[in-house]
């Protein structure tokens, strides 16, 4: 029988989704599963987007332009200007989700064997996209004890060699909820400038910042305009994960030309998704305020509740809608599996994402989990209670 590719063998399983069969089996038994494992917002999609889809009046659902509709890109220029990010429509390429923007960034900017420095824990699919592009992820570890703040510049420079081509950040961060400070962003800028690296900056959670700290975009950093490739998506801010619309943004004309070749090869981003995403920009500002206020309350509910459970510790996330928590267990992945396959409390259980899958360094994050606060508060309260009961009953607790 023919063998699968090395790429297929090396492709990692998603720590977010790989326990899904166990969750399905639990539900088949009639057990209610509280999903804290995946960043699927439960808040309503903007009415403007839903109405735009319902009111589509076209006789043909044709290909859209490979770079996305100009009308949508023009509206995005106005959206980004609110964050002091000054763009033209030509700087913006619409992609099939933020994931495609990451992949096309790698394909356009990196050669096989080139290395990308990424702070860990990191969004697990970055590794998958790097493998797809033949690139190599080199991680610099941040720790829960330090609140996931960046290490000093010397730690970065220890990793930089002739193969280093880029730094990749997610700000605010998935999975930790950490928000990079101005000092940290300037540190990254200086490294990018000194070693002439690309800076891939995933900024899909910019709407969700819960402190007085400012949002510092990679596009705000002076002197590296042609090094920056910004990754964006409508999935989280508008609860539109299913329409698969993202954006790749750069002032670097050569990068845009290269990216467009990959865009043309995949033909076009989703037509209907663009219609919905463009309409979302017309939603009254009240929508965004209500969503933000809801996440503020959920964040407090989850973090306060976690830190009241004996042996559990979570730092306070400053952005996004995730946190990484340390549990009093010997192996968080085994605990997550046990919760779905062997435990329930009054017919309920919880699904968490083992955090080890967000690290590449072996052994790190073994007793950590990522939780997403994408459930209404009463469900979060109940999920925390069930989690407490699970930890009390777990045979591998420490």
Residue positions per predicted region:
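Basic nucleic-acid-binding alpha-helical/helix-turn surface characteristic of O6-alkylguanine DNA
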Residues: 59
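PLP-dependent class I/II
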Residues: 2-4, 8-14, 19-32, 38-56, ...
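Conserved N-terminal alpha-helix of the aminotransferase class I/II PLP-enzyme fold
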Residues: 63-96
